Design a protein with these regions (language model features):
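Extracytoplasmic/periplasmic proteins that interact with beta-lactams or build/remodel peptidoglycan
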Residues: 1-124, 139, 144-171, 176
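Short hydrophobic alpha-helical segments used for membrane anchoring or interfacial signaling
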Residues: 125-130
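Short helix-capping/linker segments at secondary-structure and domain boundaries
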Residues: 36-44, 194-197, 318-323, 445-446
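Beta-lactam-recognizing serine transpeptidase/beta-lactamase-like catalytic domain environment
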Residues: 82-84, 89-91, 131-182, 186-419, ...
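Short, gly/Ser/Thr-rich active-site loops of penicillin-recognizing serine hydrolases
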Residues: 335-337, 432-446
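Short, charged, low-complexity patches
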Residues: 59, 309, 427-439
Length: 446
């Protein structure tokens, strides 16, 4: 009807054109990226590469990453035609080449489901097959509709996107964040590997606050639950900050730095999309005893990329080996080891006891996600972002890492989700609830 009205206007003609269409829209906009018409600068930077004033070029995400393969080549033909337009002779021609199809490992339903659950939050989610390394989802929220970049957006739309305080253009899964208690299983693995922590040792019930000695002044490490015995398994289940502060002190600054470097800190993740490098300090060392203690429970100056965190967690179900994540689909995928013996195989079972308890023990902080049909393990985390220990105006980052523990599981999966500003809305429990809903759909989907 609209087309008919337009055609009734003298001089108006309609024509069909082919455009790029992003069917996942907002759900994968940071991952897929978008193409745009080339600029004069593009033509200068890519001179001799087959671009013309009518070309489009990948700007970000997969579109930018695989631009050379997706682009293809334009064709043309010079021919002689008669007065009726019939070709009499082809003088010269260049056959066009279509761009290659790029197939990803992404599970589109899981990608959409994670987006729908978290779309109103400032956060991100990563999903992997923990045994093969296939990345099943990469979600950043809030997001934008990348189709708007194809058809062109108004200056008002562009201004609104850029000035939105929730930063929908900001790709959160590429950044580094304070991991909070999701870091504790890593500290447990390092303590066991270095021989500095005995998993059955009772560290003693210190109540809900503790400091090593008076040299710490007024600084106290606090925790939420008192329990006994204070062993590694229970400390993971109850998410005990004091236990892991003590564990970090036992490990020592040099041991911790070296061990974290060995599992990918301060180096690029071997992945198609460039991610920010995880760090254990703003400098090249852990400066103080308090910083070391805080590092033990994922605070201090620890910052971790979500995909890196997910990759480290693969070691807990692969005999201590960290599996390399990848995005481009491969037939008959088998896990490629990125870092071998990140943790000792015999120690992994000790860590698994704790992370299984987080999900399967009614006292565990992630028990909401418990299922009777699939054995799951995981860790919650609530990272405090504030200027000082006494600061009450800071924010909290909520985390949840959860994964299948059996390689024969029908639908193996590992999910890491992070949400900013969970203070006052349930902390990490807010993230646990949403990921539980996602997993329910995932496991029940045929």
């Amino acid at each position: 009807e609209r087309q008919q009205r337009l055609l009734e206007i003298p001089g108006v003609m309609l024509s069909d054109i082919e455009i790029r269409s992003y069917t996942l829209e907002n759900a994968a906009s940071h991952l897929i990226g978008y193409v745009q018409s080339v600029t004069a600068e593009d033509l200068e930077n890519h001179a001799g590469e087959g671009y013309s004033a009518n070309s489009v070029i990948g700007r970000s995400g997969v579109e930018g990453l695989f631009e050379k393969e997706l682009k293809g080549k334009d064709g043309c033909e010079i021919s002689i035609v008669d007065e009726n337009g019939i070709t009499k002779e082809v003088v010269a021609s260049i056959i066009k080449e279509d761009g290659k199809d790029i197939q990803l490992t992404i599970d589109s339903e899981l990608q959409k489901n994670l987006y729908e659950r978290f779309k109103d939050d400032r956060g991100c989610s990563v999903a992997m097959n923990p045994y093969t390394g296939e990345v099943l989802a990469l979600v950043s929220t809030p997001a934008f509709d990348n189709n708007d970049f194809i058809t062109g957006m108004s200056s008002e739309q562009w201004t609104a996107l850029n000035e939105d305080e929730n930063k929908p253009l900001y790709n959160r899964f590429r950044q580094i964040w304070c991991p909070g208690s999701t870091f504790k299983p890593i500290i447990a693995g390092i303590g066991l590997k270095t021989g500095t922590v005995n998993p059955s040792e009772d560290f003693g019930n210190e109540g809900l606050s503790w400091q090593k000695d008076s040299s710490w002044g007024s600084y106290q490490v606090t925790t939420l639950h008192a329990y006994e015995p204070v062993t590694m398994e229970n400390a993971i289940i109850y998410s005990d900050n004091i236990y892991f502060a003590k564990a970090a002190l036992k490990i020592g600054a040099d041991n911790l730095k070296n061990s974290l470097d060995e599992i990918g800190f301060n180096q690029k993740i071997p992945f198609e999309i460039t991610m920010s490098e995880s760090q254990y300090s703003n400098s090249d060392k852990i400066e103080t005893e308090i910083q070391l203690a805080d590092s033990g429970y994922g605070q201090g100056q620890i910052l971790v990329n979500p995909l890196h965190l997910a990759s480290i967690y693969t070691a807990f179900v692969n005999d201590g080996n960290i599996i390399k994540p990848y995005l481009r689909y491969q037939d008959n995928a088998k896990g490629e080891v990125w870092i071998s013996e990140a943790f000792k195989a015999e120690d992994v079972s000790e860590v698994l006891k704790g992370v299984k308890g987080v999900i399967n023990n009614p006292e565990g902080t992630g028990y909401t996600a418990h299922r009777d049909d699939v054995v799951l393990a995981g860790k919650t985390g609530t990272a405090e972002i504030k200027a000082t220990k006494e600061d009450t105006s800071g924010t909290e980052i909520g985390w949840f890492s959860i994964f299948t523990t059996d390689q024969t599981a029908e639908k193996p999966v590992l999910i890491v989700s992070m949400v900013e500003n969970v203070k006052g809305i349930g902390g990490s429990g807010y993230v646990v609830q949403k990921d539980t809903e996602v997993l329910n759909d995932y496991f029940e989907r045929k």
